[in-house]
Amino acid sequence: MHRPLPDAPAGVPADDPRHQRVRDAVRALVAEHGVAVSMDLIAARAGCSKQTLYARYGSKQALLHQIGREGMAATRLPEAPSAGTLRDALVAFAEAHLAHLAEPQTLGTARLVTAQAQEFPEEVAQIYVSYAGALVDRLAAWLQQAMRRGLLRHDDPHCAAELLLGMIVGLDFDRQRHLAPHRDTPEARSQWAAFAIDSFLRAFAPPAPRY
């Protein structure tokens, strides 16, 4: 069990230019140093003082947590699922998630952070909470809405979210990590995304009405 991370103090909007500089610095430095990145390095890269970072974000953990949540924002879903847009929304989500995983910075960061797991177990575990864990929670909440609206059969939404993410990613991220041939074009990723979503929707189709 890992301690939940506090959110950054209020007043740090994602579109603030100063925050954007910090965000860019964090993403670049985590790709270079993994979880060993320090607030001194972040401050130097972002062009601010370490004291400013602590005043705005509270701690390195809270800062990484906020950047992690913002990194997942690209894989958005509509606020509420509907019958007419369910498939299209999930396909768009899958395509965005696969595109994010295909970014060189994402792949490099994953390799580096995994290699640091023995040396920094708590920090690496919190990276999971901030990124993959938060994504599962958000997707589960959305799927639960779809289940309540009768668009999907009722089941454990967290299990459904984990299964769906596994279907979307398949083995392709492992192929990339091991330098094996993979789906390296948007067209190939889109084709797989549609296949994964259609398979998921068949598996979780609501029961036919009884007359």
Regions found by a protein language model. Name each.
Residues Q51:
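Key DNA-contact positions within bacterial/archaeal DNA-binding proteins
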Residues M1-R45, A55, Q61-A62:
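Basic, helix-initiating cap at the start of DNA-binding domains
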Residues M1-D7, A92, A96-L98, Q144-R149, ...:
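C-terminal peripheral helix-coil segments that are non-catalytic and often amphipathic
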Residues G84, L107-G108, L112, E122-R148, ...:
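Amphipathic alpha-helical packing segments from all-alpha helical-bundle domains
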Residues S59-H65, A74, E123, I127:
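Short amphipathic alpha-helical segment with a characteristic S/N-K-E followed by hydrophobic residues
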Residues H65-A94, A99-L101, Q105, T109:
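Amphipathic alpha-helical linker/stalk segments
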Residues V91-E123, V169-D172, A208-P209:
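Helical hydrophobic small-molecule/effector-binding pocket
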